[in-house]
């Protein structure tokens, strides 16, 4: 098997982009919000980045970053009314937002409507051209196209690692503790002095920015985007990454995206039965492990075995409950 086959290398690229998208929805889940707007923000980042690089002739990097910022701006506008909603109402509102965005892109001339945008500058192709310029075609027995794909994978991995590092940093900060408190009980968190709306908006905007970046990368990897790429199917797919891998830890999104990106390719030989088996495996796993494959306690045990942590794991919900009970006792003592 030729591991440098462009098809296999493209699967690796899609896995990394899927991991980024899974992390984008992880932030809203971490703050107790079931948002289904990730595909909408992804489409904003994809179209803005593609149009800027294709029609405004801006560098790919600049277009992708601006796409992420525009997605964040849209999140501010959408988030002000929707983050006050809870549960199913928030899910329906954000799902509706995604459909509205898709229909808008479907009817705009600048997006080429239903025909989609083609000829988008490709990151692998640009790096392949760079490989030719550096005269490394054939170096170590690897041709320029493979070098271009490998360099694209390295760049995507660096972006993914930076996003994961940012998530870990956030989780271990005051912001992460506020997210956990809101997820455990937003009413109790508010009584403890946490600005619930502010932190929910923050999670919403961060998630939108990451989704916008993921969309920009997707557009410049596939070289073509169409409004149907961001339909309801994409919404479900993105949600499955953290839910399947473990929605309580950032590594769950990475693991879930790896398995769910690879699984259809592994089952390809089953032809017509592939989707049935794929769906059955998802149902079985959700029944056996409703919290996903990875849990907080499991990640904590692995971290302590590797020497990254020394203190034993204590569930965040337990800590928050104890703090809230202590807070109530103090209030009762003051009133007494």
Where are these regions (language model features)?
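Transmembrane alpha-helices and adjacent helix-loop boundaries
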Residues: 1-336
